[in-house]
Structures are given as C-alpha cells and as structure tokens.
Regions:
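Short loop/turn motifs at secondary-structure junctions
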Residues: 25-28, 60, 86-87, 137
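Short acidic capping loops at alpha-helix termini that bridge into adjacent secondary structure
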Residues: 27-29, 59-63, 113-119
Length: 187
C-alpha cells in the first residue's frame, strides 16, 4: 500500500553544496554521510555523486564515509582523512555534530577552516549550535524541523479525515547558507 510522506530534498541540497565546493576549485571533497542504508543518506550520496558527474568528474571513493552523526565520529574520520595523500580540501558534513568533530580535527592539524580546508554542514537548526556564532561561521544547509512537525500534524489530520495516504507526498526544498567556512581551494 502507498505511504504518506514528507521529506526534505536531501539529494538536491547535497548536490548544491558539493557543486558550490567544486565551483570553488575543490576536487578532493570528503562526504561524511549518515548511517548506511538510511534513505536520507542514500539521497545525499546520490546528490554528491551527481554534482561530480555534472562536471564530467568522479569522486574519490576513499573520501566517502558513512557513520553516526557524532562529534567523535566526525573527529576520527576527519583526522584519518587529513593524514591521506592527497588529503581532502573540503568536507560535506552530514550534521552539525559531525561538523564539530571535523572542525576539531582541522584545528588540531594546525589548519584553518575556510582557508586550507572548507566545509559545508547539513542542518543548522539546533538552537544550542548557532552556525553564525562559530569562528569561522559555518556554511550550512537549513530546513525547519518545527515547520515540518507542524505540517506533519496537518497531514495526519487529512489522513484521519479520509485522504488516501498515496496522495500525500511532499518534498521540501532546503536552503544553502554560505558563510566563512567554505572558501576557494588553496594552491
């Protein structure tokens, strides 16, 4: 039976974020994605690959990783990737928590975010993690969890009112907010 759903455009926004980094000259872009098999992670992976394909390029599979959205996972993955040759010049982080770990790894390697390494993080909607207040400020994607929750409540009302689940499919656009953490590739 068809299901009702509401989702954000994970593929589209990851393609836009990756495209932006490619346009800045980055070619070694690490994707720190969510857990393997999760629908959103599959969509983000597809968006990342589509950005490369649109330019006739292929991403380096060694720079694509899946894992939990934690500071520790971001730190460990980024630390090991930074030691690689060639190292990534940019990261697409699947969450702000992952991005915090990448930020720590970049700093501990003596590099500056937005200069030697760029990053765009997904989801800056956490009230306790303000991307504008970070130094440097974090380039992020943004979608309103609160608005989605409100809309899901409305859609549940429609389902209870007899609307067929197969008629309720909403894909929401996601904003890309560019700040200081994403800069041109350094020679």
């Amino acid at each position: 039976a068809p299901h009702a759903w509401l989702d954000i455009d994970n593929a589209g926004v990851t393609e836009r974020a990756t495209s932006h980094l490619l346009d800045l000259g980055h070619r070694h872009i690490a994707l720190l994605n969510g857990p393997k098999g999760m629908t959103f992670a599959l969509h983000r992976d597809a968006g990342y690959r589509a950005a490369f394909a649109a330019r006739g390029l292929s991403p380096n599979p060694a720079l694509i990783h899946n894992g939990a959205f934690t500071d520790e996972t971001g730190f460990r993955l980024a630390q090991s990737l930074i030691e690689r040759t060639p190292r990534p010049t940019a990261f697409v982080a699947g969450s702000m928590m992952t991005a915090l770990g990448v930020f720590r790894a970049v700093r501990s390697a003596g590099m500056q975010l937005g200069k030697e390494v760029s990053m765009i993080a997904h989801d800056d909607v956490f009230p306790y993690l303000n991307a504008d207040n970070m130094v440097p400020s974090m380039s992020t994607t943004r979608s309103s969890i609160r608005a989605a929750g409100t809309r899901i409540g409305e859609l549940l009302g429609q389902l209870l009112g007899g609307k067929p689940p197969g008629e309720i499919h909403e894909l929401w656009p996601v904003e890309l907010v560019l700040r200081e953490s994403s800069g041109p590739v350094q020679d």
